[in-house]
Every structure is written in structure tokens, then in C-alpha cells.
Amino acid sequence: MSKRTYEVVANLGRRVPSPSAAGGGTPALPNCRGFANTSCFPVRKGAFSFLLACAILPVVAEVPFCALRFGYRFTQPDKWPEMRAALEKNRPAFDEVWFSTGVSFPSLAWHEEHARQCAKAADDLRKMGIVPSIEIQTIIGHTDGIIGAGDCSGQDWGTMVSADGLPAKHLSCPRDPKLIAYFVRVAEMHAAWKPGSVWVDDDLSYRNRAPVLKPGNRLAGCFCDACIAGFSRAEGKTWERAALAQAIRSDAAMRTRWDDYSCGVMGELTRAIAAAVHRVSPETVMGYQYGGPLYAAIPRGLYDGSGHPVRLRPGGGSYWDTDPNDQLNKAYYLQNLLDGFRGEKWIGACCPEIETCPRTFACRTAQGLILEAFENLALGMDFLSMFAADARTDETTDFYADDLFPRLATAHAFLQGYHAANDGTRPCGFSVTNERPAKLVACRGVPIVGATRRSLGALPDIASIGVRMAGSGEVDVHSPLYQTRVMQIASSTGLTNFYARCDRAAGGKMPVVFESAVRAFAMPRVRADWTLATVAIVNASIDRQEPVTVRLRGVPAEAKTAVWHQPEAEDVVIALVREGANVRVRLPRIGAWACGYLSFR
């Protein structure tokens, strides 16, 4: 990499911090230049504060609304007829399908045959009106173990090396010319069948590349001789591995330069892949799947190579239905991963990672997928992607054809209708200071917003509920987890009083106020003039939510009635009771872990 390229990349290396230890996940990398560390949210210079209202983001209509991701086996001759039949049988479920190149490094001859199989499957999808796309599921590699379980006969390039000199067996050095040439050729092969989009997966990241990042090491980046030599040229100083590692650990400025250099190397790799796709299929859009911090150089390389705004799919965790609250928590986290990048000319539509692991019936249900999709749309995502099928297990295709896909097909119109009703709107609620808001706060009827929002200000101190434990005095509200503890044991009276406190803090403009305590996620969406467009509700409990009265603000003056929409039920018309600026609505009974939304007409 030239000194000039390094300097350019240095301006692209900003990233969103990972969750804190309290919120779960890997601690944030330091030196997040250009960020407002008080809240772990990035704020661009010259931009409005994240607590201020900003321009309305339109729904991106040209993007297929719901994509299905699946493993490479489903496009092979013995599996594709079954999957094609399942998709035909449940045509409304999906608008796009992402094929896969697999998770190892087979020969280019294998990829050539696989591209031919994908081309045939793509023709079948187009006849159904489904957009065919593909993800390059492995470039650097997820882990040595995952890569090594497959065919690695095509790997003839160097591997990553840790800061203490430990070489990986399969994890790839991102600057190796042979690696770049291999994936440029793979990209060209698949671009020949004109995919709607080509995605690079979250293995192409700057963290969690085991065993390079091992306990006691934890320095990201490749410390092979070639990468150290490239950094030395950029620095104008010769570095040895041990001295460089020590300098990175002890010098924050050095750490920043190393981060920027390493991310820039990956950006050059993505630029080469995107340019290869663009040469063969100029209309194909590039996408980037990632978990944790977003290093701008990587998707920026996709933009520079293709000329198209890059679609983003942040992700990370909650792959089971064992704790639906965590899926809501994840939805907030994903929004925060996008904060600071929305509105950039090189960023296009964004979707959430909705994923099951290992894609069988014991992990996720159709209802769980629908709820997670609904929550992410409520918080501001543009479209949906679901990794919901895999042929690596012994799961038979009839499970998808007869169980999972039919429910998703039924819910598609509900989800798309909700998305359309939110065109030109933003979520509206309170801002919080921690990156992942306590899930029980959002699930007690208090609207909390993530990145793309209209803020009512800071969330009032939950300790004001004043909870006491029977026989043990007051709750320790100074604990790092006090929000969860207090909200978990709050009485109905204490919670109802907290609603009133929140409304006072918002100057009496809180768009949705429950008249009595609920266990529910509520997310109002408002237009530029603060009029109310929709109110999303999820019953966040294992029991039904009995009918409850909701006080609304900002209901359009011309609205005569409200309509209650649910995924698998008829719409219900509800009377509006106007009392000055307030409008009262009586919500019907909501089933356990069920969702719906109000619109107005």
C-alpha cells in the first residue's frame, strides 16, 4: 500500500464501538476517533447532536423487501429441486435469495462449477419473480476450525500471524496477492449470472479471528512479515514484530495508525472484489455483513470498486428463541452500529441479521423470526434478511416447505404493510446513555430509540421508581445492572407513576402513554411535523396482554378511526376518543409474544 493510500485510509477507519462488558460482547476497541464517548454513539463533526431531530430518511423502495439466506448446498443439483419447490409453494415469503460460496477455500474449478449451478438456480428464481443474489461467505475465514472442516485445496496463499508470531492454519492474510486474485476470479464467475447483489460476509472484519486473537494477545490485525513491512513503509520506519506489538499496546496514537492501516488493507481487498463484479455486471450492488464495530474502509472499498452505495447488514448473536427479550436488545444494538454512517453517500439500504443457528426447528420459530423482523422495522431498518435454512444438518427441506416458510409467507404482507406505513417517518422515544438499553426498560412500555430517531430527550432516572425488596431494604440502584433490576421488580403502581414521570420529562409530548402498567415493547413512528404515523406493540411476556387503554399524542387531525393490524389475523377497527391533544385508544387482547401495530385513517 502506498503512503498516499495509507493516508486516505486513515480518514476512513472510524468505527462504532462494540458492546461494553456490561451490555454483553467484546469490549470496545479504543481510540474511536470522531466519536462522542459519553454515550458510545458516533457524532460526525458538523452534524446535529444525536438528541436533535434531523431529516427524515425515506423507505428505500427499490430494494427487495425480504431476503432468504441459505448455505451453498441448496444450490447443488441434489438439493436445489427441493428448495425450488419449497420457494414456489410459499412464493410470497421472500423477494430475494442469497446463495452462498461456502465457508472454505476449494479449488477454482469447484467455484466454476458452483457458479454454473447458481446460474441455473438464478434463472429459476427470476421465473418466480425472486431476485437472485449471493454472499461470498468466506474470504479471510471465520475460524481455522470452520474453514478446516471443508475443502481447502484452493488455498495457496499466506495466513494471518498473531502479534506474538502464531501463524493461523487457514485464516488468510488480507493483503496476499494470491488471495486477492482467487476472490477476484470467484467474483467474476458469479457476476456472470448478473446477481442483484453480492455480499461479503462478516469474516472480513478486524476482530475475533481465532486463533490470531487468542487470550493474552488480543491485538487485532495481521502481523505477518508482509503486513509489518507494508506498515513500516507507510510509517517511514522499520518495525520488528515484538517492538511493534509493544508500541501498539502502549501508545494510543500508534494503535490508531495500526488500526487504520489494517482496515485499509481490507478496504483494498474489498475494492478489488467489487471492481471485478462491476466489470462483468455493472448493475450489481455490493453489500457488507458485519458483526461488532463497523470499520468504514471495508464498505468504502466496496463503494469505490462498484460505484454503487453499499448495503449494510449488521449482526451479532441472539440466534435462538430462548430469550425473545434479547432479540429486541439486539435490534437496538444493530441500530447503534449504523449510527454515524446513515446519510453517507456511499451507504445504501440497511437490513438486520435475522438468523437461526444451526437453522433447524429447535432453534427458531416462525413467530420468533416475525417478531424480530417487526422490531427491527420499527426501529428503522430498510429491509429484511433471514438466514433460515441450511443443508449442512440433517434437517429435511419439507420442514421449510411445510412449517417455516408458510408462516413467513402469511406474515409478509403484514410486515411490508407496516414498512410502507412508515415511509418518511422516524422512531420516536427517549435516548439512553448506554449502547444496549436495558431490555426490560423497553419491554415495559417506555419508548426508547436507537440510531435513526426523533428523541424526546434523555430517559428519566429509573431509580426514581423507588423499589424496595421485602425484608431486605432498598434495591442497590447504584449497581451497573440497576436498570434491569429495578424494572424487573417494579410494582404496577410504580411503573404507572414512571410513565407519568417520563411524560413530564418529555414536556407532555410523549406519543404513547399507557394508562396502566404493561409488559410490552411500544415504538411510535412520527412524521417530520411530529404527527403520529404508526404505533408498534409487542407483548413482551409469556402470557396474554389483556385489553389496555393507550393515550396517544400527535394523531392526525383528519383521522376518524385507528386500525389494529396483526400478522395472522383480520384487521380490527378501533374508535378514537379525542380529549383535546390526547386521543385514547383501547387496544384489544394481544397473545403471548405476539405483535401488532396501530395506523390511522
Regions found by a protein language model. Give the residues of each.
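Substrate-binding cleft/loops of secretory-pathway carbohydrate-active enzymes
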Residues: 208, 257, 261-333, 360-377
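Carbohydrate-binding surfaces of carbohydrate-active enzymes
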Residues: 279, 283, 292, 324-601
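Active-site neighborhood of glycoside hydrolase catalytic domains
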Residues: 182, 192-197, 201, 206-207, ...
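Catalytic domains of carbohydrate-active enzymes, especially glycoside hydrolases
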Residues: 75-105, 192-197, 372-383, 446
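Active-site-adjacent "subsite" loops/lids of carbohydrate-active enzymes
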Residues: 134-193, 206, 236-259, 263
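Aromatic-lined substrate-binding rim segments of carbohydrate-active enzymes
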Residues: 84-87, 101-153
